[in-house]
């Protein structure tokens, strides 16, 4: 009988998924510990394709610039008079301005006098001229102040704050466009078509998107709506009175409002005072006026509040630009509502549903996205709790999923035959679970019967056959990669976004940067492969993936990513394995990595690791390498590298010597150029033919 050491082999004939949290020694054949920038199609592992930069004509620009500064001192303005487009500003004390310097004026009743202006001429130490637009009343009225700066702008070189899709017979024969919302205009892009730019309103005040705004783009019928929500302080109103249709609201402290801005009044017992109103004037620092029906009861009763809001903007697909939706009391009556300011919205069953506040959902009239009935077509979810609505999402059979931060509800809102109100007998609001909720509304994606979403506890998946059992099945879909998700920046998790495409769920999340600091924007892409029923890869890019969109590219449906820096990228495009640089020129190599499961060769004892054999395919110019990672003793070293210097794709069976003693072995496959393919891998080790024995001498 031979006493030679036995050679044993262990390996993987293909690769199906990634499980980084599980003990790598327990992984089944085909599973890997880590896959970075890889695709696991048909059992082979290949580096992903490169991303192509698009839409360079978009002028949204880079992200905002943040500087330390100290504001100048406010100076009272005694008068502003106008002749033509030239206005003369007179101050109560020396202004200190020079020609060309930017002066900020605010507090004028006439909106045209408010804003940043370049000083035209210096008349005296207390007066200078500026150029204004329009024909505002002269002299100006209101409590006006001047601040010499430095200038604090809303945006510095802009950015892209949201992305969506739009198609209509009114635009390019119903071809689909990707819409990118910039700070002062929206851009519509389609492959092969000219860029379409649609500006936001500039009167009575300029409508802009500011950093920190929560922005949504949604199409309802043939109209495109841009909705914004901005954190603004609330004021408890001391009183509201009205005379001949002009309401005057009084605040206990200075409100800072100006004519032309929009304010939401809520809490009054009189429905006529409950809406988003256009501020007509601000006579003093503690009062402002707005229009209401002349028959509204005065004074207001109840506890009323006011807060500034950003009115929804709408574009009808024609040659014009965006406009504000209607404001104030609805023409149909005080109990109806126009479209309120909101950012949580969905479109289903020819109706627009939006969250007006933390627990209330309004439903629009059928085929009319700008008419709402808060009394007869609304519902509340988890009212009275410390929960809040995060997202609304269409579900099966006309139902709507209401995702709160700590719970999930299923709303069935059945309209009466007249289509005007909800039928209470046939409608319901059902709690699916109060154990998990959603922490990022853009992470929700539908895939057939499934709905994917990101929660504080991980990534989950619902379906219409399983939803009622969700309460007893709280294990997240992301459990195999929970350690990787632990790197998410929780302060920015709400910016995460997901989409389903090509049998995969893509989720972009903010994780650590290369320097170890947390990213404030989604920079890492996790991919779940539905065909393999496993996590496939963790992708990294040099640009942020602020919103994922699926649209046409030529004759195919493709996956895009819009970035906060004002760029649009087509993902998985270049076979070269090169990503376009965000800067506008040059490329960088997509570095792929795969770490196999841990090979123990059937025992926990020491072995002689001899070699590895791999079946690989290298395109022309591609380069790859293999590392061995040993356990007990620990080691990490390269065992082979390979470059295809030819002009065509080549198949290889490569062998890498290890020649180390260890208990266990991991193999790391690295790609450094091109898109190499790893088809199968085997490791060999020699094991003692006889078990280890010891001797003991007794006396």
Would you name each region that the model predicts?
Residues 126-133, 185-199, 232-233, 286-294, ...:
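Short, surface-exposed terminal/edge motifs of secreted or surface/virion proteins that either
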Residues 104-108, 131-133, 189-191, 264-268, ...:
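Predominantly extracellular/luminal cell-surface or secreted proteins
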Residues 1-70, 150-200, 204, 208-225, ...:
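Beta-sheet repeat architectures centered on beta-propellers
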Residues 155-161, 198-210, 326-495, 534, ...:
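Beta-propeller and closely related beta-pinwheel folds
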Residues 85-91, 130, 178, 226, ...:
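Generic recognition of long tandem-repeat/solenoid scaffolds
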Residues 132, 182-183, 228, 292, ...:
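Recurrent small/Gly-Pro-centered beta-turn motifs in extracellular repeat architectures
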Residues 89, 100-103, 128, 249, ...:
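Hydrophobic/aromatic beta-strand segments within beta-rich folds
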Residues 17, 71-154, 204-207, 231-311, ...:
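Small/polar beta-strand repeat architecture
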């Amino acid at each position: 009988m031979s006493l030679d050491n036995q050679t044993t082999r262990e390996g993987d004939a293909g690769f199906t998924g990634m499980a980084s949290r599980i003990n790598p020694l327990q992984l089944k054949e085909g599973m890997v510990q880590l896959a970075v920038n890889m695709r696991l199609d048909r059992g082979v592992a290949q580096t992903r394709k490169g991303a192509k930069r698009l839409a360079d004509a978009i002028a949204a620009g880079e992200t905002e610039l943040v500087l330390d500064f100290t504001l100048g001192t406010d100076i009272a303005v005694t008068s502003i008079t106008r002749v033509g487009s030239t206005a003369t500003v007179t101050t109560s004390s020396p202004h200190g301005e020079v020609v060309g310097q930017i002066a900020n004026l605010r507090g004028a009743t006439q909106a045209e006098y408010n804003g940043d202006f370049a000083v035209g001429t210096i008349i005296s130490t207390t007066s200078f001229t500026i150029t204004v637009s329009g024909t505002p009343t002269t002299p100006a009225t209101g409590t006006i102040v001047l601040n010499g700066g430095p200038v604090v702008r809303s945006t510095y070189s802009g950015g892209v704050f949201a992305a969506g899709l739009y198609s209509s017979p009114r635009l390019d024969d119903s071809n689909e466009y990707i819409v990118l919302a910039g700070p002062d205009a929206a851009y519509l892009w389609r492959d092969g078509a000219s860029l379409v730019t649609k500006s936001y309103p500039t009167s009575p005040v300029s409508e802009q998107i500011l950093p920190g705004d929560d922005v949504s783009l949604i199409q309802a019928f043939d109209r495109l709506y841009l909705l914004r929500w901005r954190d603004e302080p609330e004021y408890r109103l001391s009183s509201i009175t009205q005379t001949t249709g002009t309401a005057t609201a009084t605040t206990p402290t200075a409100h800072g409002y100006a004519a032309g801005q929009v304010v939401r009044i809520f809490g009054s017992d009189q429905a006529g005072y409950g809406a988003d109103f256009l501020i007509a004037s601000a006579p003093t620092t503690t009062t402002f006026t707005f229009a209401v029906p002349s028959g509204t009861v005065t004074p207001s009763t109840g506890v009323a509040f006011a807060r500034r809001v950003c009115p929804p903007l709408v574009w009808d697909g024609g040659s014009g630009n965006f406009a504000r939706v209607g404001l104030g009391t609805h023409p149909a009556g005080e109990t109806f509502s126009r479209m309120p300011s909101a950012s949580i919205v969905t479109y289903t069953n020819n109706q627009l549903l939006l969250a007006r506040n933390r627990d209330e959902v309004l439903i629009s009239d059928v085929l009319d996205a700008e008419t709402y009935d808060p009394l007869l077509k609304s519902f509340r979810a988890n009212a009275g709790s410390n929960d809040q609505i995060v997202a609304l999402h269409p579900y099966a059979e006309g139902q709507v999923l209401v995702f709160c931060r700590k719970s999930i509800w299923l709303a069935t809102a059945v309209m009466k035959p007249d289509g005007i109100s909800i039928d209470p007998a046939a409608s319901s609001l059902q709690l699916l679970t109060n154990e998990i909720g959603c922490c990022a509304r853009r992470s929700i994606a539908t895939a057939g019967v499934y709905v994917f979403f990101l929660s504080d506890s991980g990534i989950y998946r619902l379906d219409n056959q399983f939803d009622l059992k969700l309460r007893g099945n709280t294990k997240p879909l992301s459990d195999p990669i929970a350690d990787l998700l632990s790197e998410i920046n929780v302060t920015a998790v709400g910016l995460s976004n997901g989409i389903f495409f090509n049998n995969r769920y893509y989720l972009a999340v903010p994780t650590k940067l290369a320097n170890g600091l947390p990213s404030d924007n989604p920079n890492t892409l996790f991919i779940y492969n539905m065909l393999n029923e496993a996590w496939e890869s963790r992708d990294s890019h040099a640009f942020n993936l602020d919103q994922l969109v699926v649209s046409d590219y030529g004759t195919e449906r493709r996956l895009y990513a819009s970035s906060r820096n004002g760029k649009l990228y087509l993902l998985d495009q270049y076979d070269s394995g090169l990503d376009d640089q965000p800067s506008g020129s040059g490329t960088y190599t997509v570095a792929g990595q795969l770490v196999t499961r841990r090979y123990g060769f059937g025992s926990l004892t020491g072995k002689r690791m001899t070699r590895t054999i791999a079946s690989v395919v290298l395109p022309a110019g591609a380069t790859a390498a293999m590392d061995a990672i040993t356990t007990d003793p620990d080691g990490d070293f390269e065992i082979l590298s390979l470059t295809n210097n030819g002009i065509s794709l080549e198949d290889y069976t490569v062998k890498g010597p290890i020649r180390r003693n260890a208990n266990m072995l991991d193999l790391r496959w690295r790609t450094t150029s091109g898109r190499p393919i790893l088809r199968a891998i085997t490791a060999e080790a020699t094991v003692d033919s006889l078990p280890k024995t010891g001797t003991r001498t007794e006396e």
